[in-house]
Structure formats: C-alpha cells, structure tokens
Amino acid sequence: MLSDGIKCVGVVVKPNHEEARQTACELSEWLEKRGIALIGKPHEEAEICEIEEAGTEEFKEKADLIVVLGGDGTMISTARLTGSREILVLGINYGSLGYLTEFRIEEMFAALEEILAGNYETDRRVMLEVEHWRGNEKLASGRVLNDVVINKAVLARIIEIKVELNNQFVNDFRADGLIVATPTGSTAYSLSAGGPIVYPSMNAIILTPICPFTLTNRPIVIPDNAEINLRLKNESDGVVLTLDGQIGYQMQVGDCVRIRKSPTTFNLVQPPNRNYFDVLRNKLKWGR
C-alpha cells in the first residue's frame, strides 16, 4: 500500500491563508508526537512554525505523503511536486470549489490516523505529459492534472490548430483555442467551453474547442492511450500554451505540442462514504 512506512510528510499550504498556516502548525505538532517528520518548500511552508526546509527535488524524494491545505488551485500546483513517484496526497479544503480537496478541516486528523493504519481508499487520477516543440528544439515540458490549453489573446484573430492522434489526421480546428483535458479536468475549463463531464476513472481524454468557427466542431472524447499532436497553423499574435492554467508559454506558427498519458498517477485519498456524484451535486448545485 502507498501508506506503508510513512516516515516523512510534506505539507503544501495555500498562500497568504492564515487559518491554513495555523493548521500546518497543528499538523507539525501532531506528527512530531508520532515520530514523523514534516517538511515544506523553502521560503514558503518552511517559514511556518520552523518546519524543516526541503528544495523541490528533495521534497519529491523524501515525502511519503503530502498534505495539501488549500483549494483546487493549490492541489493542482501540488501535482507538479509529485514527480514520477507514486506519492499519496491528502487534500484539506480551504478553497471555494473543492473538487479535489474533499476533506473538511475537522476530518484531517481522523483521516491521518486511518492512513497511518492503512485503512483508506485511493482515487488514482490520470495525468498528461506535455512537450512544446519548435522545429527540432524542445522548448518546454511538464505534467498536468487538469488540462492543456492553446488559446489566443483578447484581440487576436481566430487560430487554426491541426490535430493528429497517433500520427493520423483528425481535423484543423478553427477556434479561439483548444482544450485537451483529463477526466479530472472535465469539470474545469472544458466544462465551461461546452465539454462533457467524464467520470474520473475513465480511460479518456477530452478535446474541446473554444468558441469554434464552425458549430459542427464539437468536443471529442478519445482513448487516453493515444498520442496527441497539436500544431499551430496560422500566424496570430499572442497565442499561448497553458498548463493547468498556471504555467504559460508563447507559441509561434509551426510550433507543435505533443501530449501523452503519464505513466504515473496522482493519488488522492478518497473520503469514506462520499462519492463523485455527491461532489458534483454540491459543487454544480444540481436540483437547486
């Protein structure tokens, strides 16, 4: 089990949130009594209650469990910290949405006791690996939990994106942009752009055009073992590639974005007696 031999816990705290910072102090004391170390990133969580500092690489290597005190944005940034390791993640909701941070603060210590005892369920979320190429030069790479987005600046004209799956031509999308989303990301930007809600455990990826020029260019659901190539076909100022809405890169005509399923998953502790549709009904206010 992922919880076997937890000796070190990493903490990620929502920036500038005093209540979350105070909870991190309480967590530090709770773990210390049980002989478990707590680490945080330098100049961030490590400034709270003298929590031990750990650089990004050290954080990835040492943490056996990550506790996230924040909202979905904090959780998404945490996904980049797990690297290629199968690290267990416990999300405590201090944000406004909480699709991913499903535990309430009053449930945290009871959840930790269950994790240490090995009594928990894991929700394994698909992640995508992304590469940005210009000719034969790889400009950037990363991993996303929610989505990869190519879109235009406010005043830029419509962009044209060539889409290939496993080197087979699919379509030239003429639109304000294109979203490539995981099932986790299906309730984020893709949903706002008219994409479907996809159950988190489905082996699928969603391609959702943003304000397509042709109304018949609809969202497409594809198997997650497909390799996706996106190529910007026309000149347009201000076209940006965005990873999980948090990291952005400028694109030029001819640039290619390669996307494939990551071999590692993002492993969330699942609350007992609570399911995905409970979350959807609450967050999307179904029936109200």
Q: For the regions a protein language model found, what residue spans apply to each?
A:
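ATP/NTP phosphate-donor binding region
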Residues: 1-65, 106-121, 132-142, 272
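Redox-cofactor binding/interface segments in oxidoreductases and associated redox assembly factors
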Residues: 11, 68, 180
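Short glycine/serine/threonine-rich phosphate/pyrophosphate-binding segments
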Residues: 20, 73-79, 187-192
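Short, well-ordered beta-strand core segments
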Residues: 66, 89, 178-179
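Gly/Ser-rich helix-loop-strand patches that form or flank binding pockets
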Residues: 77, 82-92, 99
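Catalytic core of DAGKc-family lipid kinases
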Residues: 97-176
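ATP/nucleoside-binding phosphotransfer catalytic cores, i.e., glycine-rich phosphate-binding loops
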Residues: 150, 166-169, 215-288
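Gly/Ser/Thr-rich active-site loops/lids in small-molecule metabolic enzymes
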Residues: 171-216
